[in-house]
Every structure is written in C-alpha cells, then in structure tokens.
Amino acid sequence: CALPILIHSIGRNRPGTMSAWIERRIFPGAHPPCLSEMMQIFEPHSFSVLDVENLRLHYARTLAHWLERFEANADKVEAMTDSAFVRAWRLYLAGSMASFTAGDLQLYQVVFTNGACNDMPWTRWRLYNDTRSSKEKTWNPVTS
C-alpha cells in the first residue's frame, strides 16, 4: 500500500473568490478550494481518496481561543505594531470564527494515496479509541 497523504485545507462549499479585504490585508494570493476543485487535481493522477473529514466547528473553536488570547495581549501586540494591525487581526479572527460557525468556510482533511490501498481499517473506530489496544482488525481482500 502506498503511504497515505493528508491535505489539510481551509475551503468553501462552492468555487469562489476570497473577500477583497482578506486578500489585501491577511492572505494575499490565497485560494480556499471547494472539494470539487480538490478532486480535479486528484483525478488526472489516479489518486484514490480514502477519507474526507470536515473539521469546521473545531476550527471555529480554535479561532475563538485565538481571539481570546489575542484580546488578552492586544496592548502588547499594538506596542509591537500599530492600532490598524490590531483592528485588522481582531476583525479577521472574529469574522473567520463567524464564517466557520455559519458554515461559509470549511476545514477539510482529505486523505488520499496514489494506488490501491486495501490494507486499512474499515471504520473510524481507531480514531476514537485507544489504538494500542485496538480490537479492530484491518481487512485486506488479498490476504483475507
């Protein structure tokens, strides 16, 4: 089995452009893809998608923690930069948190491989349980 590869990417539900403000102030040149755009890259190269997971609510919570810590240190940040920087990042963190919470932005994790990968668990049981004592077995149609 070829080693699986993980792509972890902020994305969106449909093709589109970034907000002009984010493009100009925060992430120049960034493009959060939708899943169909990601698949267009995989398909010509015969990559097999093994798993797709959306962690948008996890990321919304992460952004909430970042915003809380940013606010607790805003005076220090402003002393190192300026008030415009603090306002921009406050808006970015709060706006992003709202976008992930509302489902306008996504956080995709796509696992793929460049060949037949049959020696893998059937379920996600291993993700939610102690894998050191895992009762789940892998199923390989070639050897089973």
Where are these regions (language model features)?
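Short, small-residue-biased leader/transition segments that mark boundaries at the very start
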Residues: 1-3
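Substrate-binding/catalytic lobe of Class I Rossmann-like enzymes that use SAM or dcSAM, i.e.
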Residues: 10-120, 128-129
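Short, cationic low-complexity segments
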Residues: 125-144
